[in-house]
From Swiss-Prot:
MF GO annotations: structural constituent of ribosome
Protein name: Large ribosomal subunit protein bL19
Lineage: Bacteria, Pseudomonadati, Bacteroidota, Flavobacteriia, Flavobacteriales
InterPro entries: Ribosomal_bL19 (IPR001857), Ribosomal_bL19_sf (IPR038657), Translation_prot_SH3-like_sf (IPR008991)
NCBIfam families: rplS_bact (TIGR01024)
Keyword Ribosomal protein on entry: yes
GO biological process: translation
GO cellular component, one term: cytosolic large ribosomal subunit
HAMAP family: Ribosomal_bL19 (MF_00402)
Recorded superkingdom: Bacteria
Species: Flavobacterium psychrophilum (strain ATCC 49511 / DSM 21280 / CIP 103535 / JIP02/86)
Length: 116
């Protein structure tokens, strides 16, 4: 049964080629919003908190600061409304899920750049 589900996912789900990113990276996600009959592109720029799942059900969480309020948004990787993902900065973190980042404020909330 699992083989059948994997086959269907591989054959019929259209995957877009997004860059490889992980926790700690600062990315910008461009996605389409429909308002009535109009469609427009909006972007969400923030730090990747986590990637979870695999295959068709994979999602990633982004956190940004809007004023003094933290805003998190969860995006499915296979969302048809996703247009593109840009990596602004690669971050050096030691965890795959950086939930501790939610409590940090000020200079402590800064993520070091990954050395190349």
């Amino acid at each position: 049964m699992a083989d059948l589900m994997k086959f269907v996912q591989d054959e019929f789900v259209t995957r877009k080629d997004f860059p490889v990113f992980g926790a700690g990276d600062t990315i910008t996600v461009f996605y389409e919003i429909k308002e009535g009959e109009k469609t427009r592109t909006q972007f969400f720029k923030g730090v990747v908190i986590q990637r979870r799942g695999s295959g068709n059900t994979e999602t990633f969480t982004i956190r940004k600061m809007s004023g003094a309020v933290g805003v998190e948004r969860i995006f499915p990787v296979n969302l048809p409304a996703l247009q593109k993902i840009e990596i602004n900065k690669k971050g050096a973190v030691r965890r795959a899920r950086i939930f501790y980042f939610r409590e940090l404020t000020g200079k402590k909330a800064k993520i070091r750049d990954k050395r190349r």
